[in-house]
Amino acid sequence: MTKVAVEKEEPGVVYKVAGSLVIAENMSGTRMYELAKVGWNKLVGEIIRLEGNYAYIQVYEDTSGLSVGDPVIKTGNALSVELGPGILDNIYDGIQRPLERIANVCGDVYIYKGIDMTSLDHDKQWQFYADKKLKLNDIVTGGDIFGFVDENKLFKEHKIMAPPNAKGRLTYIAPDGSYTLKDKIFELEYQGKKYTYGLSHLWPVRDPRPVLEKVTGDTLLLTGQRVLDSLFPTVQGGTCAIPGAFGCGKTCVSQALSKYSNSEVIIYVGCGERGNEMAEILSDFPELTTKVDNEDVGIMQRTCLVANTSNMPVAAREASIYTGITLCEYFRDMGYNATMMADSTSRWAEALREISGRLAEMPADSGYPAYLGARLASFYERAGKVKCIGSPSRIGSITIVGAVSPPGGDFSDPVTTATMSIVQAFWGLDKKLAQRKHFPSVNWSTSFSKYVRQLEQYFDNFDQDFLSLRQKISDILQQESDLNDIVQLVGKDSLSEDQKVVMEVAKIIREDFLQQNAFSDYDYMCPLQKTVGMMRIICHFYAQCLRTLQEYDSRERKIGWGSIYNTLRPTINKITHMKFENPKNSDEYFKKYFKALEEEITVGLRNLMEK
């Protein structure tokens, strides 16, 4: 027994170095996905294959300078993240190293090799409030809430939970007061042994945190983007994909979601994208505020960034996705609605392809590994609305929004096709729309959402006409795409009057409803009340125009779209200017505004008929 223990303590030795993959020998006694420290600099690595005495380690730092014979230390632990107060308003790399604190220590633009620093600040004092319902000798299981920490003005209740694998009889709980992450908060006794716990705990990133059961999502994820909220809505706890070529606005859509969605926590993972995009978030987010108790509070206080840009080690891209989703699961277990932005899953798949190539695995389509679909599915499967373990009972959700960057905007790319088969909402971005400066460039013909039926009750409670208005707008856009072929062949003049109305109303929908300027004061986001009001006005105008044309046909007095346009030009201008209404206006204001405009359309067309 002693001999085995000594052998386990004996370090392994580097046998071969191939880019980010290191093969080490003398590694008996290790497990899959165990953390290893490679070389004299103690670079962080993870064991991804075991063959006899050899371990294949993917290293999350630059391996230049490693040589055969360097030591490899076995840690006995899996790659884990530290979960506790201080995660929000922070920026990490792919393996949860705090970049801001590292920059202060290094004083350089580059991270030093093998730097070892706690993910959370262990010296910062947090004000802890214990749960008064808990008594000594109570039986405690994983997920039970012991109290909460006042984290910041926007995220006031950071709940302190027992780790999912903890259980026992409560023998100590700290009174209200200021504590650091090093201090003992509660103590459990199980089978004669005592276990102490603090404000934070570790959890392996590859293991999904346990839940009681999954429940059906039935609440709309408000994005503030009209095209998404109206035509392709998604639920809190849903899975969405945003595929698109370069320059289509994927990052802009995911940033808009981070800024204005109705989630309580945002985890933004920049996985292999440009560093400037993360820098843009770091410069934009601190300026964005939201009102809390009549006080402006920075939106960064509900956001955590996991930055793994394209010039960082490729292997860490894979880890960054798992790090992000584990942070999300932690907030979900508190009973909050968390959203994870993965920008972009294509870069993650490319990292899988590179590591798979180094392992000499058989390549499948486009060189990606055969298990690409399974890995994507296991990642997206961690989304959902759930009943959390522990007491008191609570419901939380994780929404995953994954950007996909297919080369050349080709949606038949393996990553895009695998993602399409998994996700329930598909917001396909179109290069042609982007070139016409139509943003967000969501193609209404190729995109879809399977959540509409789940959201029926929600929309009925909000506005009974919503689903019929949504269907009507989809029909008008579909009719326009069918008529476009005729127009290109024989011109607009050959169309009948009602077809001309379809074309003109579809133009209003495209240019004045679906288009949205993310950088303007009036259209950076759109509340649902304004979206529904705009849909109602457009559909009402369309229905009234068709009714007027039909009545004139029966009276044998010809009237065309030209007459309607000339008579109602001021009203049509008002319809096209609806989006300029300030989104900060109250719901009551929007109801009055749209009611007056609806009346104006009805009266205008009635006067035209009476002439």
Swiss-Prot record:
Keyword field: ATP-binding, Cell membrane, Hydrogen ion transport, Ion transport, Membrane, Merozoite, Nucleotide-binding, Translocase, Transport, Vacuole
Positions in coiled-coil regions: none
The keyword Ubl conjugation belongs to this UniProt entry's keyword annotation: no
Binding-site residues for ATP, renumbered to this chain: 244-251
Family matches, as Gene3D superfamilies: 2.40.30.20, 2.40.50.100, Bovine Mitochondrial F1-atpase, Atp Synthase Beta Chain, Chain D, domain 3, P-loop containing nucleotide triphosphate hydrolases
Chief subcellular location: membrane
A GO molecular-function descriptor: ATP hydrolysis activity
Pfam families referenced in this protein's UniProt entry, alphabetically: ATP-synt_ab, ATP-synt_ab_N, ATP-synt_ab_Xtn, ATP-synt_VA_C
Activity regulation remarks: ATP hydrolysis occurs at the interface between the nucleotide-binding domains of subunits A and B. ATP hydrolysis triggers a conformational change in the subunits D and F, which induces a shift of subunit d. The c-ring is subsequently rotated and results in a continuous proton translocation across the membrane.
One GO term of the biological process aspect: ATP metabolic process
Membrane topology: Peripheral membrane protein
Compartment list: Cell membrane; Vacuole; Vesicle
Biotech uses: Possible candidate for an effective malaria vaccine as determined by epitope response in sera.
One GO CC term on file: food vacuole
The keyword Iron-sulfur belongs to this UniProt entry's keyword annotation: no
Subunit structure: V-ATPase is a heteromultimeric enzyme made up of two complexes: the ATP-hydrolytic V1 complex and the proton translocation V0 complex. The V1 complex consists of three catalytic AB heterodimers that form a heterohexamer, three peripheral stalks each consisting of EG heterodimers, one central rotor including subunits D and F, and the regulatory subunits C and H. The proton translocation complex V0 consists of the proton transport subunit a, a ring of proteolipid subunits c9c'', rotary subunit d and subunit e.
Functional summary from the UniProt entry: Catalytic subunit of the V1 complex of vacuolar(H+)-ATPase (V-ATPase), a multisubunit enzyme composed of a peripheral complex (V1) that hydrolyzes ATP and a membrane integral complex (V0) that translocates protons. V-ATPase is responsible for acidifying and maintaining the pH of intracellular compartments and in some cell types, is targeted to the plasma membrane, where it is responsible for acidifying the extracellular environment. During the trophozoite stage, involved in the acidification of the extracellular space next to the cell membrane.
PANTHER family linked: H(+)-TRANSPORTING TWO-SECTOR ATPASE, V-TYPE PROTON ATPASE CATALYTIC SUBUNIT A
Family: Belongs to the ATPase alpha/beta chains family.
Name the record gives this protein: V-type proton ATPase catalytic subunit A
Native organism: Plasmodium falciparum (isolate 3D7)
Higher taxonomy: Eukaryota, Sar, Alveolata, Apicomplexa, Aconoidasida
Originating gene: vapA
